[in-house]
Amino acid sequence: MSSFLTRNLINRGLILQCRGIALSSLKGNNKSEEASTSHNTANVSPSKKTALYNFHVNNSGRIFCGWTLPVQYSASVIQSHLYTRSDASIFDVSHMLQIHVKGADRVRFFEKLIVSDLENLPENSACLTLYTNDHGGILDDLIVTKTSEGYLFVVSNAGRATEDLAHLHTQLAKAKRQGLDVDIEVLSNQALLALQGPRSAEVLQPHLPSSLDLSKFYFMQSRLTNFDNNSSIPCRINRSGYTGEDGFEISISNANAERVLNALLSSGIAQMAGLGPRDSLRLESGLCLYGNDIDEQTTPVEADLTWTIGKRRRQLADFPGAKIILEQLEKGASRKRVGIKSSGSCPRSGVEIRNSRDDKSRIIGKVTSGCPSPSLKLQNIGMAYIETPFSKVGNKVTINIRNRTMEAEIVKMPFVPTRYYKAPTNKKK
């Protein structure tokens, strides 16, 4: 990996992840990197490949272990990151879990698992929501689309696929015993492409029917359509993503994935990008990574994700962990997710945070994610959980990395303004 950012991450053992998938603890020298990114397919389990694996190999995607997805392409992580911010990049996120929830009672069933209000969500709209447990902890974060075709389209983290499916099937069995009309279909033959960046609509629009005008298709809206007006290439398009930029997530069959990808690349605008820039883009945008920034011991209140909890759901208090979560909403939580900026070495996950005043030896929090920000000229940024009394923006704290104490500051997130293509609001005079 050629960029300063990637070397920085490797040297500090930061776990690079793509929404829910840990690539590895990236330590070592260039020789070990080359060994890790070898294009030898003989030892790669088919179950760990996406439909676009051969495309990545043939187009210089630097494959890493685990899920065989590229960390980067020929461009450095920084170059891909900045290109996404200025133009458009395509990410293969086909490893993520895609499911359909079907049946007349699908909304009633799924609301028993999450915190959001699906009943009042308009058709062909999506929302970010959370699976929670009875203790108020976050089991996973996910995107749910309420389609006009009579099903819910759900996309959740690959790293939680086993746990999510077990949870879903347990709850499904209970629902069926109660007489609910509901079922789940795992879309194992579907790929998922994320086209992200300010020129994404320019890339995608020529491949859509004239009835789908992207200038009137807004953030978190969804549509089932045909790619290139070809009825043999149906696809679901959501205007959403994990970079903070305008963009689209396109669900297509594995059989059509490479064809669609090549068509998008033929614009000469979009470039391929890997998991390295995806991680730094989401961090700059203040977006959580499951397993780092949220987990089963973290509540939506602590994670500053209370906006995902629907007003009706709060009133009914009928979601898992509602008693604990609503009590924290009323009285506050003991800790809070915050943004930090620091000088010196970049803080990585697990680095302890201490009070810079009074008792400087007392640990008041821990870093959960960190990287040098490409958009901010490699300014060190990170997310952390800090005791609530110390979480005020502007508060100074200290971090210790390799026996060196450095100052950090609590800052607002996102670190870089998000640029979602939102519907215009009607302002009353």
Q: What role is predicted for each listed range?
A:
Residues 73-74, 109-113, 350-351:
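Short, glycine/acidic-enriched capping/hinge loops at junctions between secondary-structure elements
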Residues 57-90, 132-138:
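N-terminal flexible segment immediately upstream of the FAD-binding catalytic core
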Residues 85-175:
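Extended, compositionally biased flexible segments
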Residues 2-18, 22-65, 69-72, 148-150, ...:
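Conserved, structured C-terminal
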